[in-house]
C-alpha cells in the first residue's frame, strides 16, 4: 500500500485517473505496487509472509494480461516501482537528518 501512496502529483505523479474505470490501468498500478513491495522488502531484509487471499488469482490474471499485451510493461512497472522505493528511502533519510539536527 505504501507504493500506492507515492502516486499523487505532489509525490511521483503517477496518473491514477483511470484506475477505477480501466482494468488494464488498475492491473498496471497493482503490478507497480507489488514490485515496489518486493523491492522494499529486499532492501530492508524483510522476508514476506505469504498469506493466500481469494483475490490472488484475479490479480495474477490481470498482470498476465497486461504483460502479454505489452512487452514493455514489466520494464515500465519496474521503473515506476524503483522510483517509488527511492522516493520512500529519501523520506527516511530526510527524517533521519532532521533528527540529527534536532
For each feature predicted by the language model, list its residue ranges:
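Post-HEXXH active-site segment of zinc metalloproteases
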Residues: 5-31, 50-60
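Short amphipathic alpha-helical face segments that pack within enzyme cores
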Residues: 31-39
